[in-house]
């Protein structure tokens, strides 16, 4: 029986066909996903676009999370015990703006300029035009800069007052009528944040909040110069800066205040030039042109734009499944980061691909622990979903059983090395990661006499996570063979394995079993694929 897929309710949004711009106005601004589509980020800070409304989660920090226990009605051996959970942090990006006592509402037009990395929002308050240009600096890790321009010719009083809002309250109700994915985590009933210190001086305001289980402290600060004008200017331009910093082993406030001070001293115009220059260099290496198809070119460019905004570039985190746009999938990193995202950067921005591999290598000890938890006596098993390195999946059959994640990471490593010629990553932990992850295949697979002594891998889940715990998933077996072959080559060269282990790896790769269905003349997804109704 075919599974009905629920209608997500999304409609086409008229964003225009300019290859460099996305524009929304009119009814398009009312659609629920506009705030996601117009999100900004720099790999550390993620800022949702306009449309969510006041008090809604708005700002996220890549790699910052809280640890929360996973509750099972009946747990079993190998089940993850806790999850990493991305939470929205304090919001230092949205000042109070009012004209003649009327607070500014939602924008009438928003424009995302992918050439410059700037989002422009246009408002009308009592017939007076207001424009806010905003950027999340690609050159300054935690910095957000905004320029507010107001036509004051008909205004008697303009008030611009920066503020820092506390982290929003968590979602406290679970509506099964609109939740179709069993892997969605249950809601939190109370805030996970512990408020530390609040700061307010003549120059800045802010706060420091702490997540007790993970140990993260997060500082959010904003410039605080409050501007009040009483009809003495025809045009007003005013810049506001915000900065974020996070740490697990110190006080982030000093770092945030330093970043804020440096941004203030540079000024918005200078930061806008920095941003434009950064993207000019990026597009020189990454730009895709599709002649005579501006909408297609726009779509491809937008995908590239969001990738580079979402990926961490310092090796301390990676790229979440939903990027920096929200809390979807709890902010977890999945295997799509290695198989789909990293190759893009390997051929366009190899330093970013390298940083993604550095993060994976740093997780090797956690992957070894995960393998022991899953009952393997040797090797390393990377988690299906994680932020900090431990398995966070509470959906064991479709999650932890996806052993192919090891081969996906090996594919990413090989792609990077062959695309760039940079073999130093192998000496810096890449070769060890490759070998340790390959050893898992020799643990869970075996040469099966029933299949002509071919090497089989049973009771695993492939990319089709709705067909869980199958024998000889085609994708898994093909990827495992390539993984084993490469690990034998690199492991021998690095003297991490002996000849006997290399022979075992190569034999398994050569004799990997691939389920071919003679009746249909095609390879099956797994051994039991054609027996399903």
Where are these regions (language model features)?
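Active-site core of glycosidic bond-cleaving carbohydrate-active enzymes
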Residues: 333-362, 428, 485, 489-533
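Alpha-helical scaffold segments in carbohydrate-active enzymes
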Residues: 302-309, 359-366, 432-444, 482, ...
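Beta-strand segments within the central parallel beta-sheet cores of soluble alpha/beta enzyme folds
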Residues: 131-132, 161-163, 318, 355-359, ...
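Substrate-binding groove/exosite segments of carbohydrate-active enzymes
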Residues: 47, 270-418, 533
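C-terminal capping/lid segments that line or modulate ligand- or cofactor-binding pockets
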Residues: 28-72, 340, 389, 401-402, ...
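The feature captures the catalytic groove of carbohydrate-active enzymes
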Residues: 325-333, 380-428, 436-507
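Short, mixed-charge aromatic SLiMs
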Residues: 70, 168-176, 326-331, 362-370, ...
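Acidic/polar, glycine-enriched structural segments that form the non-catalytic walls/loops
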Residues: 2-40, 45-50, 54-329
């Amino acid at each position: 029986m075919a599974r009905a897929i629920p209608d997500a309710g999304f409609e086409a949004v008229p964003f225009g066909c300019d290859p460099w711009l996305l524009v929304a106005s009119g009814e398009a601004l009312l659609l629920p996903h506009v705030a996601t589509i117009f999100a900004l980020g720099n790999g550390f800070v993620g800022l949702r676009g306009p449309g969510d409304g006041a008090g809604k989660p708005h700002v996220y920090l890549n790699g910052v999370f809280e640890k929360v226990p996973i509750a099972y009605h009946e747990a079993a051996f190998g089940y993850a015990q806790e999850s990493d959970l991305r939470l929205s942090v304090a919001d230092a990006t949205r000042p109070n703006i009012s004209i003649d006592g009327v607070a500014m509402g939602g924008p009438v037009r928003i424009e995302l300029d992918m050439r410059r990395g700037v989002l422009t929002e246009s408002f009308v308050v009592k017939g007076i035009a207001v424009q806010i240009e905003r950027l999340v600096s690609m050159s300054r890790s935690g910095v957000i800069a905004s320029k507010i321009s107001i036509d004051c010719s008909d205004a008697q009083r303009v008030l611009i007052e920066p503020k820092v809002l506390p982290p929003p309250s968590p979602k406290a109700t679970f509506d099964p009528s609109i939740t179709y994915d069993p892997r969605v985590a249950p809601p939190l009933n109370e805030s996970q944040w512990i408020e530390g210190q609040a700061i307010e001086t003549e120059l800045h305001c802010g706060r420091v909040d702490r997540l007790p289980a993970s140990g993260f402290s997060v500082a959010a600060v904003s410039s605080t110069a409050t501007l009040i004008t009483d009809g003495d200017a025809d045009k007003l331009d005013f810049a506001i800066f915000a900065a974020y910093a996070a740490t697990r082993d110190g006080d982030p406030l000093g770092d945030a205040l330093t970043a804020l001070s440096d941004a203030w001293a540079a000024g918005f115009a200078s930061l806008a030039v920095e941003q434009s220059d950064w993207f000019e260099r990026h597009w020189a290496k990454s730009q895709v042109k599709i002649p005579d198809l501006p909408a297609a070119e726009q779509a491809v460019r937008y995908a590239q734009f969001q990738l580079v905004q979402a990926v961490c570039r310092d090796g301390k985190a990676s790229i979440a499944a939903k990027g920096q746009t929200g809390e979807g999938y709890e902010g977890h990193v999945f295997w799509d980061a290695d198989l789909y995202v990293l190759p893009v950067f390997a051929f366009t921005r190899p330093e970013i691909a390298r940083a993604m591999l550095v993060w994976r290598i740093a997780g090797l000890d956690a992957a070894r622990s995960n393998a022991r938890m899953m009952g393997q006596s040797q090797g390393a098993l990377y988690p299906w979903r994680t932020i900090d390195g431990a398995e966070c999946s509470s959906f064991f059959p479709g999650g932890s059983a996806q052993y192919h994640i090891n081969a996906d990471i090996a594919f990413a490593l090989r792609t990077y090395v062959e695309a760039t010629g940079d073999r130093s990553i192998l000496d810096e932990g890449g070769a060890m990661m490759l070998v340790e992850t390959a050893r898992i295949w020799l643990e869970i697979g075996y040469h099966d006499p029933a299949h002509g002594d071919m090497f089989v891998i049973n009771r695993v889940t492939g990319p089709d996570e709705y067909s869980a715990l199958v024998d000889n998933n085609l994708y898994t077996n093909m990827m495992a063979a390539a993984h084993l072959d490469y690990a034998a080559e690199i492991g021998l060269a690095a003297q991490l394995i002996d000849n006997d282990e290399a022979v075992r790896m190569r034999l398994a790769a050569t004799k990997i079993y691939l389920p071919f269905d003679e009746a249909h003349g095609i390879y099956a997804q797994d051994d039991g694929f054609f027996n399903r109704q």
